[in-house]
A protein has these predicted regions:
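Hydrophobic alpha-helical transmembrane bundles of multi-pass membrane proteins
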Residues: 24-25, 33, 49-54, 135-139, ...
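Hydrophobic/aromatic residues within the transmembrane alpha-helices of Major Facilitator Superfamily
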Residues: 23-30, 60-63, 67, 148, ...
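Membrane-embedded alpha-helical modules
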Residues: 93-207, 211, 321-435
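Helix-loop-helix hairpins and the membrane-proximal interhelical loops
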Residues: 1-49, 163-164, 195-279, 429-430, ...
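Helix-loop-helix junctions within the multi-pass membrane cores of secondary transporters/permeases
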Residues: 2-36, 57, 78-87, 91-136, ...
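Loop-to-helix transition at the N-terminal end of transmembrane alpha-helices
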Residues: 43-63
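Juxtamembrane transmembrane-helix boundary signature
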Residues: 59-79, 110
Length: 435
């Protein structure tokens, strides 16, 4: 029954690892429960209502992933996408948050249509195999950078853009301890090393004043202030088209990048680098975004933190089911879950980033025609703070280098350019030129 419902294979998987994987994924992405209300409330949305809708939309989308796609990936309102929603569409362009929610709804409906027609899968297949292999290490660097930043180990600098943080602060010291502890547990091959590291680091943070414990149970705030709040009279404006297309580009290629990267790490791809049941995963993403807009939150997407659950042993829909259950529990135990500091989850993000670098061995950097675009893809993800920008620039550079060097065919035919790859590059160039 478990195999039919969730794709659980008892010959290669264990319930313990699936549950640990799901809990680990939740703990590494639980920060969104604090961050999303903070960002979206800047638009005038009710922060308490946003907290509740963040949980509910994550539950619904992740359950679709568990039952329909049967994959160990979890979803929630996406970082970056929520910032674009609040700080660009509302605070910069001057539109209401209801206008932004309408754009998210339209994007979700378009995604459902693209998924049903199979067009999203064709877009994935248009990305050359070698670039798909570069996505995983690029994401690894990106989430490691996010972990270092959230821990305070690195910080912004006007002189050098980024520099070391205060290595004497309790938070940074706690994070470095968590990294060393978790790394040691991983070296010893302790099952659930990431989860154990997070929990121990959180507990040690209490006397240091880093872990802020403020209670256990609270009643979930009502979603009424933001539920089904749309603004229809502006849907045919040029700005609405631009906003919808921007949401589409960012969400599509963040999701594609995350699915390919995490699936490569989990060994859930075929010889041609194609992700298992990717179309079903796309549907979970599309449904999550559509339902999220109805509830009152920004675009829902697959979380790169799913890699932490995969590395903890999660391989089936049971992992994402566990994460969904954790989000339900979080509705009732918000103060308890929100007590986990970013310094505790930083170790998981950084070490998962290390693990995801494994795929880089499949990229031949001595072949400059493919090596340079892969380098561009990998390095731009952390430097632009965007998975999608890394993929887009990687594809553009791949096509241009092939064209200018006259190398239209690769020694591996799976890396050959075709009309779809060239069309993608043209669309990406237009995206940067006009959006």
């Amino acid at each position: 029954m478990l195999q039919k419902l969730f794709g659980f294979d008892p010959s290669t998987m264990t319930l313990r690892k699936e549950v640990i994987g799901g809990i680990t994924t939740f703990l590494t992405m639980a920060y969104i429960l604090a961050v999303n209300p903070s960002i979206l409330s800047a638009t005038g949305m009710d922060a308490g209502a946003v907290f509740t809708t963040t949980c509910i939309s994550a539950v619904i989308a992740t359950l679709v992933m568990a039952l329909y796609a049967k994959l160990p990936f979890s979803l929630a309102p996406g970082m970056g996408l929520n910032a674009f929603f609040a700080f660009t569409v509302v605070l910069t362009m001057g539109y209401t948050w209801q206008f932004a929610l309408t754009a998210v709804l339209i994007e979700g409906l378009i995604f459902i249509l693209l998924t049903i027609t199979g067009l999203r899968q064709h877009i994935v297949n248009a990305i050359p195999l070698v670039l798909r292999r570069a996505i995983s290490p690029g994401i690894g660097l990106f989430i490691a950078f996010v972990g270092l930043q959230s821990a305070g180990i690195v910080k912004s600098s006007e002189a050098t853009v980024i520099t070391l943080g205060n290595l004497h602060s309790p938070g940074v010291l706690l994070a470095m301890f968590g990294i060393l502890l978790t790394a040691a547990l991983m070296v010893k091959k302790v099952t659930g090393a990431l989860l154990i590291g997070i929990l121990i680091t959180t507990i040690i943070g209490i006397p240091l004043g880093v872990t802020n414990y403020s209670g256990i149970i609270s009643t979930p705030p009502s979603i009424e202030p933001i539920f089904w709040q749309f603004e229809w009279h502006n849907i045919l404006t040029a700005d609405m088209i631009v906003v919808v297309l921007t949401f589409l580009f960012i969400d599509m290629f963040d999701t594609i990048g995350t699915l390919i990267g995490v699936s490569n790490r989990a060994g859930m791809v075929d010889d041609d680098g194609n992700v298992t049941r990717i179309n079903q995963a796309f549907m979970a993403d599309a449904v999550g975004t559509t339902v999220g807009a109805m509830l009152g939150t920004s675009t829902v997407t697959v979380y790169v933190e799913s890699a932490s659950g995969v590395n903890a042993g999660g391989r089936s829909g049971l992992t994402s089911l566990t994460t969904a259950i954790c989000f339900v529990i979080a509705l009732l135990f918000a103060p308890l879950f929100l007590a986990i500091p970013s310094q505790a989850t930083a170790a998981a993000l950084i070490l998962v980033g290390v693990m995801m670098m494994y795929e880089i061995r499949k990229v031949d950097f001595s072949d400059y025609v493919t090596g340079i675009p892969c380098f561009v893809c990998i390095v731009l993800m952390p430097l632009t703070y965007s998975i999608s920008d890394g993929i887009l620039m990687g594809v553009i550079s791949y096509v241009l280098i092939h064209l200018f060097s006259g190398t239209l065919k690769d020694k591996d035919e799976r890396n050959n350019m075709n009309w779809a790859t060239i069309l993608l590059a043209v669309l990406f160039i237009c995206r940067y030129a006009f959006l």
